[in-house]
């Protein structure tokens, strides 16, 4: 079997996910993509990928939490006779509470007299709940959130520290209402998982110190000897290379392995474990050369495969709307080194140029506040713009 493992498959995505999907589509063989993050509505993303022709029918998808739930996480409820999808609807009125429309579509806030005690978000104009927040009357912050899938089934409960927006734990439920996983989170940094409990038949089955060990357990149970496994996420290098099956592990390096002249911490394990790696796929000859300057890895373990883009020949160019600007599109994460882009742009302006820099992306590591601080320090607020993507 040929697998690709990655942490996430977002609906809106940049370079890494785009390159992953194009590689798989180009090969057009029977692939299974395994993801290890939690998402209660993954089937809707798979459907969108197929509608947009990003994957072929040869591609299968599986999520780690789907497997942990014994494949009950994404089970679609059906009506008894026609077997059509069944939607659980929740009235928008709550007895004894005053409701007020929120700023977002489908968002309603509920008040006990003047005290905000609950909020609900519905999917569009339907009566299918997306989430429900329970609000502390003393702090005004939510202390608990219930999340529902597209059919209105509860799939997660999140719990928050008192007087804080930080989450301390969550509980994951299958479509039959059984809790199969409980996770605990650090307060710093970035609310990383620092404890996982797995339940079977309502009894504690296994525990893990973090989600890397959980991913290793998942891979150990899913792979067999001689499976071919592409890994596109550095977070999963250790779980993949520490599982004990004799798999052909192919590590795809989507960005630079260097931070200045030092090897990035996220790359060290993979590059130190070359005996367990079948191939490293790199972007450039220079990247291969740089890696071999630091690690004794043979030439035959490298394969050069640059990223590529598809040109849409049907789109007509409208020169009347051309804007003179640099554009970055991708994740706002530490590994992307957006600060380097901003500093390089600052040097560019010092040469007398006036082209603006526009940054499009999703904040993953709380980078936007740091970016805004740097932009202010360099007095670039009128030249650098940040947009959600």
List PLM regions with ranges.
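Glycosyltransferase donor-sugar binding loop
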Residues: 356-369
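Conserved donor-binding/catalytic core segment of Leloir-type glycosyltransferases
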Residues: 317-336, 342-345
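Nucleotide-activated donor-binding/catalytic signature segment of Leloir-type glycosyltransferases, i.e.
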Residues: 368-389
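Short N-terminal targeting/anchoring amphipathic segment
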Residues: 206-212, 216-236
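A short, histidine- and acid-enriched strand-loop-helix "catalytic/donor-clamping" loop
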Residues: 237-238, 247-265
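Acidic anion/phosphate-binding donor-loop and adjacent secondary structure
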Residues: 260-264, 308-324
